[in-house]
Amino acid sequence: MQANDRPRTFHLTVAYDGTEYCGWQVQPEQRSIQSELERVIRPLAGRPVRVLGSGRTDAGVHAIGQVARCVLPVWKADTVALQRAINSKLPNDIRVKAVRETRERFHPIADATGKQYQYLVQVGGSRDPFANRFVNRVGGPIDHSAMQSAAAKFVGRHDFKAFQGTGAERPSTVRTIHSARWIPRVATGPTGAELEGEHWCFEIDGEGFLYNMVRNLMGTMLEVGRGKKSPNWIDEVLASRDRKMAGPTAPPQGLFLCRVDYPDEVFQVEEPDVIE
């Protein structure tokens, strides 16, 4: 076999506006991010290709750094050419930001060592028609110091069963969170004018997350920010392991999957035997 005739496995970094999609995963009779990528990559591969993502994002959730894997039976050009070929056929609200070749056995879920999510919140001010799909607007006032204290409660290794959404239960609900913090931000519209209200970003890094976990953490912290609960209530919710004890699920539109981390060895491509 010639080196350029072997199947090649690729790591795609994908960004998308999830507003018009049913989510990442293929669903019958609906548009999904996965189905759009598979539709575009199929003619490049000459056959149906399964595109596997690093995790499911729900309808309305966005990504800056989702990771997907695809295997092409024969691709003789470089990764830049593949990126351009895919992007030339994708709709405007999905883009492949980078393509890297990986080892054959690369798995975007099993090989991931960490993820980062951000959730954008607008406190007060009028709802902006352009930013509306990317931010959760809430009424004020909000106690940001209390929410910062609540966020700190999530850092470390905990059982997050109380924050697991229904429909995708995992055998273990224990996860390690490396950092969780609220960051003030300046938000601007298409013309560069600063938007009304206060704008905040909740940023969380961890080894992995349960289904709907970040949105459930958000809804719970907002209960604290509104003064309905104290930051110490978070300890009670974690200890309860009961979803009913936590706050409501926050809306999807403020959530972004920003980054998925992998060890360097994922990108160490095995050299095939070359038959002279």
Swiss-Prot record:
Transmembrane segments: none annotated. Homodimer. It is an enzyme of class 5 (isomerase). One of its GO terms (molecular function) is pseudouridine synthase activity. Substrate binds at Y117. It catalyses: uridine(38/39/40) in tRNA = pseudouridine(38/39/40) in tRNA. This is tRNA pseudouridine synthase A. It comes from Rhodopirellula baltica (strain DSM 10527 / NCIMB 13988 / SH1). Formation of pseudouridine at positions 38, 39 and 40 in the anticodon stem and loop of transfer RNAs. The active site is at D58. Gene3D superfamilies: Pseudouridine synthase I, catalytic domain, C-terminal subdomain, Pseudouridine synthase I, catalytic domain, N-terminal subdomain. One of its GO terms (biological process) is tRNA pseudouridine synthesis. Its EC number is 5.4.99.12. It comes from the Bacteria. Belongs to the tRNA pseudouridine synthase TruA family. Pfam families: PseudoU_synth_1 (PF01416). Keywords: Isomerase, tRNA processing.
